[in-house]
Amino acid sequence: MSWPLDRKNKSRICNRGPKPCGYWGSTFRFRVALLVWLAMSIAAVPLSAQLVRGSMDVHWNAGAENCKAAPQPPIQVHRYETQTFILRQNLCVSYEGNFLYLLIGDQRALLIDDGAVSDPTEMPVARTVLDLLPIRGDSRIPLLVVHTHGHTDHRDGDPQFASLPNVQVAPFDLKGVREFFGFSAWPNSMAHIDLGERVIDVIPAPGHHQAHVLFYDNRTGLLFTGDFFLPGRLLVEDTAADKQSAARVIEFVKTRQVSRVLGAHIELDENGETFAFGSHYHPHEHSLELTTDDLFTLPAALNAFNGFYTRYGNLSLMNQNRMLAVQAILALVILTFIVWSVRRLWRRRRRKRTAVPVNV
């Protein structure tokens, strides 16, 4: 069978209508290509569009110059979203001003760090956290308490949780951390915590502390960095380990949508200057949240780190142990000089007193 010709355009006419014969085939292919493109576009929608968004519209308590004259609540609670809470310990109770993070899943909840104060009368961490947990049946959902690392200001609240029902406190030493989370190849593997429809990734990041870990929440895109990365002094105990951790964390971040980077302290003012060690008053603080762009500057800062103290952009890196050792040596040198000067002066005076006058 031959198709009739369009005498004017010299093209064959299909029986489906006055269109060139190739029209219907090309239209079908176009529609298929369009559907494939739409499917690929939907699949390629950034994960950030699927994240649960929260609010950081909060003004953190700045402490006080005179805490006795200005008593304040020991804990400030901010609801980031319905199942995520940020708690800050008041600077007047502890100059560390720790941030704690409560993440609630369908089956259990996770508390990241429990702060710098063990006395529940001064800092009622356990009571505050339990009051935020939802009730399932006749009791509140189980709670798991973990630590970004083992420094005391991140685990001194452990005793408040130790004897509570439906509460488990994770270990903080290196051996305990590796076994509890089930890392297959520390520090080059990850672990996961399933809270029920909410999975938390656990990323090893030794350097500040040998058992330091970060937590990434797949629900909100929040990355909790503890003392590894924060708006303040980055205390580096092991530079080589910290460099390797920074590289691993950045590679991890490139595969995830990170909405905010949240550390454990604020030690900078809004101009990027550090508050004095031990200060109970932080007026005009830097924001708690950092970005992945901030995080991406860490490798260069670590490469520039001289092992003692380095300022790199807004980052202040220091090895606290070495700085304390240098200060101790300087103090010893100064004390030695003072003692030597006093003894020398005393000997001069003694020689003058005992000198025999010469008769001419």
Regions found by a protein language model. Give the residues of each.
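Active-site HxH/HxHxD metal-binding segment of metal-dependent hydrolases
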Residues: V117-E197
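Conserved beta-strand hairpin/beta-sheet module of binuclear metal-dependent hydrolase folds
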Residues: P74-I135, F215-D227
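Short, low-complexity intrinsically disordered segments enriched in A/P/G/S/L with frequent Arg
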Residues: S2-L5, S11, R16, P20-C21, ...
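Short, hydrophobic/aromatic-rich segments at coil-to-beta transitions
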Residues: E81-I86, M190, V199-D201
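Accessory terminal helices/loops
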Residues: Q50-A69, A247-V360
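Bacterial N-terminal signal peptides
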Residues: A33-A44
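Metallo-beta-lactamase
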Residues: A109, A116-S118, V199-P206, Q210-D294
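Short, intrinsically disordered terminal tails adjacent to the first/last structured region
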Residues: M1-K10, K352-V360
